[in-house]
């Protein structure tokens, strides 16, 4: 801080006040620069996350379309008659076994 007791004239006081004012202005300018940089980083990160979420939305939309078509075909096959019920049960068993095999293999690769 300024040393007011050593100031001998009004010119010295003005010089001290001017130096302190410049120091505080420089400090404020550096803080503003840091805040601006932080705001720009947040903006960039937000835009990246929005792009990522838009991509996920389109992925989920396409997966929903695929699953809807599969469910319709599966339902049509189930309603088509008794002969297909054996096939339907066989497919269900194969899918369940495949699920357990894949989960086992994935658990082994992670450990």
Curated annotation (Swiss-Prot):
Lineage: superkingdom: Eukaryota
Any one GO biological process: retrograde transport, endosome to Golgi
Modification type Phosphoserine: residues: 9, 37
InterPro entries: BET1_SNARE, T_SNARE_dom
Keywords tagged on the record: Coiled coil, Golgi apparatus, Membrane, Phosphoprotein, Protein transport, Transmembrane, Transmembrane helix, Transport
Domain t-SNARE coiled-coil homology stretches: 15-77
PROSITE patterns to which the protein is assigned, alphabetical: T_SNARE
Subcellular locations according to the entry: Golgi apparatus membrane; Golgi apparatus, trans-Golgi network membrane
Transmembrane parts of this sequence: 87-107
Subunit structure: Component of a SNARE complex consisting of STX5, YKT6, GOSR1 and BET1L. Interacts with STX5.
Role summary: Vesicle SNARE required for targeting and fusion of retrograde transport vesicles with the Golgi complex. Required for the integrity of the Golgi complex.
Name of the protein described by the UniProt record: BET1-like protein
UniProt organism field: Mus musculus (Mouse)
């Amino acid at each position: 801080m300024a040393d007011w007791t050593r100031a001998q004239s009004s010119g010295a006081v003005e010089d001290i006040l001017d130096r302190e004012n410049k120091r505080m202005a420089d400090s404020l300018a550096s803080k503003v620069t840091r805040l601006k940089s932080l705001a720009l980083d947040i903006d960039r990160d937000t835009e990246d996350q929005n792009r990522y979420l838009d991509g996920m939305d389109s992925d989920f939309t396409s997966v929903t379309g695929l699953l809807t078509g599969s469910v319709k075909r599966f339902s049509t096959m189930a309603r088509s008659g008794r002969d297909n019920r054996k096939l339907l049960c066989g497919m269900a068993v194969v899918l369940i076994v495949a699920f357990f095999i894949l989960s086992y293999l994935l658990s082994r690769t992670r450990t």
